[in-house]
């Protein structure tokens, strides 16, 4: 934890070979994973572990994440993840992140919106249901609350592939893990596109939780000024909408 404030959490992660893609660059899902792990550690440091939350039937549900990338990390790099709560607005909590390399250069920054939920009823809980006080950190800010992803209605989408939620994708709530959605988005692009384009970020809104056995039709747009839009849908529901931020 940061020595200057108990409200700012810092945690180090080493990039392993299994965290990288065929180009030896860190996967987008790896960044989402270490951000999630750092956020869990930050809350645990305040006296509320994930285990105790699960016993109480509570959990955190990410709603929207907006990540900007300067570059993807390389194998064996040591990364410092900084994360802090910016407090809540009604039932919604905002959490920011910055990721630095060993030289202190920022690789990525992100804004996110979360909700505290009753795991059994899948209902959003009021902040007062949290048995600890999560004070906001006010010394830094990545930005305002991220907007919900809106795919332009006139933008044509085509099915890239279909994905079925299985054992390897599940989290401890038996839903598809948040970080895995980044893999679903990245898999919508052909290798030729990854050779030609540079990833500069991800903007994603999680609409419905995907359960074991559910099939997701992953739809994508062509390249736009913003990047490639991706939607996961199936069974008459939309699971997520996202924009892979890309440039030539």
Residues of each region from the PLM?
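Hot-dog-fold acyl-thioester-processing enzymes
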Residues: 1-62, 109-111, 118-200
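Alpha-helix C-terminal capping segments
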Residues: 189, 220-221
């Amino acid at each position: 934890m940061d020595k200057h404030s108990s409200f700012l959490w810092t945690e180090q992660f080493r990039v392993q070979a299994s965290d990288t893609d065929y180009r030896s660059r860190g996967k987008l899902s790896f960044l989402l994973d270490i951000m999630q792990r750092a956020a869990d550690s930050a809350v645990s440091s305040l006296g509320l572990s994930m285990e105790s939350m699960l016993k109480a039937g509570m959990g955190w549900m990410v709603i929207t994440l907006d990540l900007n990338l300067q570059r993807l990390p390389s194998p064996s790099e040591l990364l410092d993840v900084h994360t802090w709560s910016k407090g809540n607005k009604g039932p919604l909590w905002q959490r920011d992140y910055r990721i630095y390399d060993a030289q202190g250069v920022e690789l990525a920054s992100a804004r996110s919106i979360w909700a505290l939920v009753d795991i059994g009823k899948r209902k959003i809980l009021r902040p007062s249901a949290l048995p600890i006080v999560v004070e906001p950190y006010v010394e830094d800010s990545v930005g305002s609350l991220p907007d919900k992803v809106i795919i332009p209605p006139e933008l044509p989408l085509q099915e890239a592939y279909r994905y079925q939620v299985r054992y390897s994708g599940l989290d401890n709530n038996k839903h598809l893990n948040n970080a895995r959605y980044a893999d679903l988005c990245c898999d919508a692009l052909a290798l030729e596109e990854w050779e030609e384009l540079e990833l500069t970020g991800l903007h994603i809104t999680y609409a419905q939780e995907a359960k074991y056995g559910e099939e997701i039709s992953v739809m994508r747009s062509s390249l736009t000024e913003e990047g490639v839009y991706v939607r996961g849908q199936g069974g008459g529901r939309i699971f997520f909408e996202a924009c892979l931020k890309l440039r030539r």
